[in-house]
């Protein structure tokens, strides 16, 4: 008669089989179900999600195995809004506990895509008839910059946007502008008209005396070479000012 072969739990490892049977299955982390539910809520009604929930969703790709809600809330507490989170300096984003360089890179990628998307709505198009799109683009590109930027939109004879360039970047409250350089660049691009744009990091788009004086100098320099300055727009965090609309040029 063949001898029964011992198995673990039949003498050599008493109770081993029972232990295996009693070992509970590993449960999913608490955030796993939350992620699925949040994704479904986004599919059903994206506008119903709070800002921190949208950030949570965005962080899922960068943070695979952790709860992203505390990080999303920490980002908003630190920077103030989704727009300010996306435009915050990469090194400051990385300092948020749980974020690090991977999250910082992910957020800067989204910022770059958003800016390029807005830019595509105005490039090589007649901009004077699409003024809202121009303002939306400039707001996306400049409203939350921490330093002043002086941007020039160069137009051809049909008022189509042929180039968009940041000519100068200054401090928190000043950007040096050189009319001769602006006109020179317009001639190089064969532009017949330009729109001047700069931001106020303070958030208030009200033109200063220096803004008005500089604009008049630029208008005169451009006029001498048959280049039209259509407007000078100042971008704030929650609005803009048009020197043309204010009858300051």
UniProtKB/Swiss-Prot annotation:
<dbReference type="GO" id="GO:0006508">
    <property type="term" value="P:proteolysis"/>
</dbReference>
<feature type="region of interest" description="Disordered">
    <location>
        <begin position="1"/>
        <end position="34"/>
    </location>
</feature>
<keyword id="KW-0479">Metal-binding</keyword>
<dbReference type="InterPro" id="IPR020891">
    <property type="entry name" value="UPF0758_CS"/>
</dbReference>
<feature type="compositionally biased region" description="Basic and acidic residues">
    <location>
        <begin position="24"/>
        <end position="34"/>
    </location>
</feature>
<dbReference type="InterPro" id="IPR037518">
    <property type="entry name" value="MPN"/>
</dbReference>
<keyword id="KW-0482">Metalloprotease</keyword>
<keyword id="KW-0862">Zinc</keyword>
<dbReference type="InterPro" id="IPR010994">
    <property type="entry name" value="RuvA_2-like"/>
</dbReference>
<feature type="short sequence motif" description="JAMM motif">
    <location>
        <begin position="198"/>
        <end position="211"/>
    </location>
</feature>
<feature type="binding site">
    <location>
        <position position="200"/>
    </location>
    <ligand>
        <name>Zn(2+)</name>
    </ligand>
</feature>
<dbReference type="GO" id="GO:0046872">
    <property type="term" value="F:metal ion binding"/>
</dbReference>
<feature type="binding site">
    <location>
        <position position="211"/>
    </location>
    <ligand>
        <name>Zn(2+)</name>
    </ligand>
</feature>
<dbReference type="Pfam" id="PF04002">
    <property type="entry name" value="RadC"/>
</dbReference>
<dbReference type="GO" id="GO:0008237">
    <property type="term" value="F:metallopeptidase activity"/>
</dbReference>
<dbReference type="InterPro" id="IPR001405">
    <property type="entry name" value="UPF0758"/>
</dbReference>
<keyword id="KW-0378">Hydrolase</keyword>
<feature type="domain" description="MPN">
    <location>
        <begin position="127"/>
        <end position="249"/>
    </location>
</feature>
<feature type="binding site">
    <location>
        <position position="198"/>
    </location>
    <ligand>
        <name>Zn(2+)</name>
    </ligand>
</feature>
<dbReference type="InterPro" id="IPR025657">
    <property type="entry name" value="RadC_JAB"/>
</dbReference>
<keyword id="KW-0645">Protease</keyword>
<protein>
    <recommendedName>
        <fullName>UPF0758 protein BMEA_A1330</fullName>
    </recommendedName>
</protein>
<comment type="similarity">
    <text>Belongs to the UPF0758 family.</text>
</comment>
